[in-house]
Amino acid sequence: MKLSPPHRRRASAALVLCAGLLLAVPPVMALTPLPAPQGAQQGEGYRLPSAALQAVVDAPRTPSLYLSPKGDLTAVLQIPALPSIAQVAAPELKLAGLRIHPKTVSDSRFSFGSKLWLASNIDGKERQITGLPQPLSVAALTWSPDQKYLAFNQLDPATGANELWLVDVQAGSARRVAERLNSIVGTGYAWLPGGDALLVMQRPAGQGAPPQADGVPTGPAVQQTEVGQGVRSVRTYQDMLKNEDDARLFEYYMQAQPVRVSINGDSTPVGTAGIYLGLSASPDGKYLLSQRVQRPFSYAVPVNRFPRNIEVLDAQGKLVHTVARLPLVDGLPTGNDAVPTGVRSISWRADAPASLVWAEAQDGGDPSREAKVRDAVLLQPAPFDKPPVTLAQLGSRYAGVTWANGELALLDEYWWKSREVKQWKIAPDHLDQAATLLVQRSEDDRYSDPGEPVLHTDDAGRSRLQLSADGNSFYRIGEGASAEGDRPFLDRVELSSGKSERVFQSQAPYYEMPLSISEGEGGRILTYRESNDVPANLVARSLAADAQPVELTHFAHPLPALRGVKKEQIRYKRADGVELTADLLLPPGYDAKKDGPRPVLMWAYPAEFKSAADASQVSGSKYRFNAISYWGPQAFLAKGYVVLNDPTMPIVGEGDTEPNDTYVQQLVASAQAAVDEVVKRGVGDRERIAVGGHSFGAFMTANLLAHTRLFKAGIARSGAYNRTLTPFGFQAEERNYWQAQDVYQKMSPFNYADRIKDPILFIHGVDDNNSGTFPIQSERMFAAVKGLGGTSRLVMLPNESHGYRARESIMTMLAESEDWLDQWLGAEAGKKR
């Protein structure tokens, strides 16, 4: 399993040690104003920032780690430098919400690894792998359930190759076992139970060339509402089908033929080709759960809303049972708790040979209806000749099950409106046995979070609840939020009483996150550990008394000569008493008393809360690695700026009050408190503070410049500024525009463009497909500021989506931001701009 920093995660051994890049600089770097950038010119070309910022972009990246099912091995995948704009600009198709690479028949925006090796989790020794394809381009990697093999996609956009390769772990050698994969949706392959074969999605043999449009329309594109359908919210999706030519292309590229591929490369077709959104084997390997898309398609919603047939097939692909035929979902009732009617979230029960589990709304999927039971959770075992039985009836929405055995499972439910989370202990083989409530809390209350259940991989390759050796307890891993900051932990939870015993907790001066636990030989846990100047490394810990931790990896600081950034987690209050938190980062060698206040870059992202107490909680840890990547604000420490990173900007609405009813007032109050705090500490020059953000942070930036004069400049990347263009909700806003016109209007900085008196830089990807942040949002906002006499600059990055990928784009983003900050903040305090 891949290792990545945990965020609401369920599996313990699923963490990628991806350390960011820290950039330190000499103690003082003079900031001098640059000539004002000229108006946008055609053919300006891509740009380079200063050498210090280039170093951030080109610094080596920490490898990704994939723990084996038994936890004694790690597959290490080196991530290469950023792709070039030539790679990012390769032709792609935008169909039904998907972005397709037509040559490889894959997701066009995949990332890949360029070097692969194995490492022991006992002593850290590394093993090389022979026979790997060159150049290596690993798009997805998974362990076999028995840990004998590693499978991975090898993609080559130049040739169009999309291949499946296996690594024999014992032999340390690799070989190709399948070609012509279709990995537009998912990885294109999955291990079958037992680990002796894989289920592979291949392009159909003899498919021929893709259909070509002749440029002559066959007729208009028509959409029509249904009589009596009522209010149906439809988000502002992008990359939708536009006409029948698009529909035929979509059908062509999405066609996949399931094939059983054994580890020796023998292959057997399974069933028929189709447009599969899912195909998964039952734990006993005797059945397949199939989800196939059917016409009619839609011009308004993406593929996951298209009509689909949910069926059970046998191992050869023959139909055994039809579970449901789901219609097109072209809209939902208003509210974030709204769901489609019918079968939802269907999967195999992980601890049973072949049993299906799914949820069905009992309130018509409409959260505005009064209903004691919102969702029913249903269970249907093979041979599927009897009606499903009810596993649970829930007062909110089904959020999944963690399976252990017939005596134990943990069932989750969630209600967005109240943020309430519940977790129940159930006995799935004893439906007459009452459920026990284990957890009931607000999702926003991080201090009360008991952690997520620890999972293990069973012999069928299924993730199941890990029990203690005596079967009387299970484990939880959590972030350990507290008034002292995050201190990750591992708890053992007694099943009979529900009492927790702390097995491990992170201690200063480290931030240490548990990954897995094994009970043999006194007990052993794997963690990843980091500190301010050392990136995250994999560590083994014996639970025996006085045992010393053993570092299994030794990832060094990516820029060892550039250390010394000082980080402090600061606390302060805004005017209404809500407590706020931020990371204050100071340039290397900087001394406030000796050097005086500096220019400040503040970078933030607002969040909605239903409780002022929850909004006031501390988040983050002062012991985390001072990671600086090109994506965040910290790189500008290289220019001598003070950085206030992630100052909390809570938007609170308690009880029946919606948070956004007072969005602007609360946003301004939080910003005022942050500015006052850095000035009070003597590190920030009040006359030289800039604010910036990405996406909803860009929206925040434009609002702060429209409603305050706290900031001398702003950087707004990939934002939305006119909320009438997202009329069916955005972020946590559930109401549609016609229910809350005044809120939508007041929150839209576009309506106050005439009040933006300080310079604002807009950056946006031309191909942004994020729901709500259409590129036209930045184009129209820039035009408004420009037309009203404001100071602004618009940078549209070709071929980039909501996040930017090409090296040239990232360099240009930094160069533009650097010039903007130097120009408007670089002048001495008080000097006229």
Task: Enumerate the predicted regions with their spans.
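Bacterial N-terminal signal peptides that target proteins for export
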Residues: K2-V16
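Beta-propeller folds
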Residues: C18-G20, M29-Q548, H554-G564, E579, ...
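N-terminal signal peptide c-region/cleavage motif recognized by signal peptidases
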Residues: A24-V25
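Conserved hydrophobic/aromatic pocket- or pore-lining residues that grip, position, or stack substrates
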Residues: I310, L356, L438, L538, ...
